Design a protein with these regions (language model features):
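Intrinsically disordered, low-complexity and often Lys/Arg-enriched segments
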Residues: 1-2
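N-terminal core-binding DNA-recognition domain of tyrosine recombinases/integrases
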Residues: 6-100
Length: 101
């Protein structure tokens, strides 16, 4: 097992993701790596965007697309610490609550 995959599995475990979800996320990452024939940490945001567009254009099932998208978002945001616009920004609940007060 690569150190990167081990790190993602640790991150998913810390996040409380179910075993089945973890397996689905790892499988989605394998498909991405196989598609580009290189490690996902070496891919650009544009390459990941094109990959997701390709899934849509091929007409994969909605659930398959969502698992792929969520697994990529988890990997790039949580494991690698990359906040890409592709996945949108998450609102900071504390900042939102403070602004409302």
């Amino acid at each position: 097992m690569s150190p990167l995959r081990a790190r993602m599995i640790e991150d998913m475990s810390l996040a409380g993701l179910a075993d089945a979800t973890q397996k689905a996320y790892i499988q989605a990452m394998r498909r991405l790596a196989a598609h580009y024939r290189r490690s996902p940490d070496l891919l650009s945001e544009e390459e990941v965007r094109c990959y997701l567009l390709g899934l849509r254009q091929r007409g994969v099932a909605r659930g398959t697309f969502q698992i792929s998208r969520y697994s990529l978002r988890f990997f790039y945001y949580h494991t690698l610490g990359r906040a890409w616009a592709l996945f949108g920004e998450k609102k900071d609940r504390l900042a939102t609550a403070e602004a409302a007060a």
